C-alpha cells in the first residue's frame, strides 16, 4: 500500500545516532528484554480519531490538516478512504494495535438504523484488512458526547429517550468491538457530569450511570465478549465536573455499585494533569488497587487548563509511567494508546509519522530506564529502609494488629524523644537523573 503516504517508507529502527527523522532511535520492536520483545512489552496503539479524522479545527479557526483521504464529498466514501489510509499508516509504522470510536470509523445517518448500516459496511471493510494485517484492535468505544442529543449527558441524561439511544449505541459498539477482535472496551463519560447542581439530581444520575454499566456487563456476557471493560477518568472538559473525576473517584463509584469486579481504568496522562495529579500518581493508585488496565499515552501543557493531547516526549515522565507498568507485571490486555494529535500547525500527512515516532521512542527509552530501575531496586531499597521501623518492635505490633491505643500510649509515654530521618528526596531525584542520562 502506497497511496496516501507516498513520501514515507516503512519506519525501521536505526538507533540513537541516526539522523533519519523517519526512523526509530530507541524503539526496537524485536529487541528482547526479560523474555519478551519491546513490541510485546509496550503494546503500542494508534488512535483512529486524532490520526485520521481530526482536521485541525479549533474554537478560533478552520481546518488546517492536509488529509488526502478527505477529498471526497460523500461521508461514506471518506470513511472508506480513511480505512485505506489507516492500514497504510499501520503497516508503515508497524503498529501492533489501533483504537476507535464508533463515529470515527463511520458517519452518522439520519436514523439509528442508517447509522448502524454505515457501521456494518465499514466494519466489513476493516475486517478484510485485518485478515492480512498484523495490526489488531486494542479497544473500541462509543462516542456519546459529540451529537447534540448528548447535551445533558448520555447514561446520566435527564431524558430517558437519550438513555435508551445511548444503550442502543453502546450495544452496537460492543458488537463491532467483539467482531473486530477488540481486547478491551472503554467508557469515557465526557458528558456524564454537570454544569450546576441547581438543576441536577446527582444521586439519581450516578444511579443511572451504574444501571447503564450493569446493562453493558450483562450484554457483554450475552454475546460472549471477553474483553476487559475500562473506565477512563477525566475531571472536566467538556463538562464542568465529570463523574469519573480521577482514579480514586472511579474506584469508589465502582465499589459502591458492585462494578469493581468487571472494570479497570484506562488512564490518560493529560487527564491526570487536569485533575491536578502527577501521571505517576494516577498509575500508582490504580496499580496498588489492582485496576490499572490500559494507558492513553499523551501529555498536556502545564501552563494551559485544557486537554491539549500532545505527543509524549518527556523521558522522565515515560520512565516513571513504565516503572508502574513493570511493577504491575506488565500489561495484560491493555497497552499504550497514543491519544495524541499533531499540533494544528503540523498539518502535513508526514507529521503523523513524526509525532508517533517521537512518542514511541520516548516510551521505549522510558521502558528501558524503568526496567533497570526496577531490576536494581533503586527506590525499593530506599523505601524498605525508610519504613524499617515497622519490621519489628512497636511497628510490627501495629502492622500485625497486636497494638491498640492503650499499648501505643504506654509506648509513647516511655519514649524520651522521637528521632526522624531525612527523606532524601534530592538524592533520589539525582539518582533518577543518573539512570535517565546514563549512556
Swiss-Prot record:
What class does this enzyme belong to in the EC scheme? isomerase
Enumerate the residues binding Co(2+) 2.
268, 271, 307, 309
| A GO MF label | xylose isomerase activity
Main localization, broad class: cytoplasm
Entry keywords, A to Z = Carbohydrate metabolism, Cobalt, Cytoplasm, Isomerase, Metal-binding, Xylose metabolism
* Any single GO BP term: D-xylose metabolic process
Catalysis: reaction(s): alpha-D-xylose = alpha-D-xylulofuranose
Instruction: Identify the catalytic residues.
Output: 101, 104
List locations, semicolon-separated. Answer: Cytoplasm
> Could you give one GO CC term from the UniProt record?
cytoplasm
For this protein, what does the record note about how its cofactor is bound? Binds 2 cobalt ions per subunit.
> Per its Swiss-Prot or TrEMBL entry, what cofactor is needed?
Co(2+)
The residues the record assigns to binding Co(2+) 1 are 232, 268, 296, 339
EC number of the protein: 5.3.1.5
Its family remark reads: Belongs to the xylose isomerase family.
PANTHER family in UniProt: PTHR48408, XYLOSE ISOMERASE
HAMAP family according to UniProt: Xylose_isom_A
Assembly state and interactors? Homotetramer.
Q: What is this protein called?
A: Xylose isomerase
Query: Gene behind this chain?
Result: xylA
Amino acid at each position: 500500500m502506497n497511496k496516501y503516504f507516498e513520501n514515507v517508507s516503512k519506519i525501521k529502527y536505526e538507533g540513537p545516532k541516526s539522523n533519519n527523522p523517519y526512523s526509530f532511535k530507541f524503539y526496537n520492536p524485536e529487541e528482547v528484554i526479560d523474555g519478551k520483545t519491546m513490541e510485546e512489552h509496550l503494546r503500542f496503539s494508534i488512535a483512529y480519531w486524532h490520526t485520521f479524522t481530526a482536521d485541525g479545527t479549533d474554537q478560533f479557526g478552520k481546518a488546517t490538516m492536509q488529509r488526502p483521504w478527505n477529498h471526497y464529498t460523500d461521508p461514506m466514501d471518506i470513511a472508506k478512504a480513511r480505512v485505506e489510509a489507516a492500514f497504510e499508516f499501520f503497516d508503515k509504522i508497524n503498529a501492533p494495535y489501533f483504537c476507535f470510536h464508533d463515529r470515527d470509523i463511520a458517519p452518522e445517518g439520519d436514523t439509528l438504523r442508517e447509522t448502524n448500516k454505515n457501521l456494518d459496511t465499514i466494519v466489513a471493510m476493516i475486517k478484510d484488512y485485518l485478515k492480512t494485517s498484523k495490526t489488531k484492535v486494542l479497544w473500541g468505544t462509543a462516542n456519546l458526547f459529540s451529537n447534540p442529543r448528548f447535551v445533558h449527558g448520555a447514561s446520566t441524561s435527564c431524558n430517558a429517550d437519550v438513555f435508551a439511544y445511548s444503550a442502543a449505541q453502546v450495544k452496537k459498539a460492543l458488537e463491532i468491538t467483539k467482531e473486530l477482535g477488540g481486547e478491551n472496551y472503554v467508557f469515557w463519560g465526557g458528558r456524564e457530569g454537570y454544569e450546576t447542581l441547581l438543576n441536577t439530581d446527582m444521586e439519581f444520575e450516578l444511579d443511572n450511570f451504574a444501571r447503564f454499566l450493569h446493562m453493558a456487563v450483562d450484554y457483554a456476557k450475552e454475546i460472549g465478549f471477553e474483553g476487559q471493560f475500562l473506565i477512563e477518568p477525566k475531571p472536566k472538559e467538556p463538562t464542568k465536573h465529570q463523574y469519573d473525576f480521577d482514579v480514586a473517584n472511579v474506584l469508589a463509584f465502582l465499589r459502591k455499585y458492585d462494578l469493581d469486579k468487571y472494570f479497570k481504568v484506562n488512564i490518560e496522562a493529560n487527564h491526570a494533569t487536569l485533575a491536578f495529579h502527577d501521571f505517576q500518581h494516577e498509575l500508582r493508585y490504580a496499580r496498588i488497587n489492582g485496576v490499572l488496565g490500559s494507558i492513553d499515552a499523551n501529555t498536556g501543557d502545564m501552563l494551559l487548563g485544557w486537554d491539549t493531547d500532545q505527543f509524549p516526549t518527556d523521558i522522565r515522565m515515560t520512565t516513571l509511567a513504565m516503572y508502574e507498568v513493570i511493577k504491575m507485571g506488565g500489561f495484560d490486555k491493555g497497552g499504550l494508546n497514543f491519544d495524541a494529535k499533531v499540533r494544528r500547525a503540523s498539518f502535513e500527512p508526514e507529521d503523523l509519522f513524526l509525532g508517533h515516532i517521537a512518542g514511541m521512542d520516548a516510551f521505549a527509552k522510558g521502558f528501558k530506564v524503568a526496567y533497570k530501575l526496577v531490576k536494581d531496586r533503586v527506590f525499593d531499597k530506599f523505601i524498605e529502609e525508610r519504613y524499617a521501623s515497622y519490621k519489628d518492635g512497636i511497628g510490627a505490633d501495629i502492622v500485625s494488629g497486636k497494638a491498640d491505643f492503650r499499648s501505643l500510649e504506654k509506648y509513647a509515654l516511655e519514649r524520651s524523644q522521637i528521632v526522624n530521618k531525612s527523606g532524601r528526596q534530592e538524592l533520589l531525584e539525582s539518582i533518577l537523573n543518573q539512570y535517565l542520562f546514563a549512556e
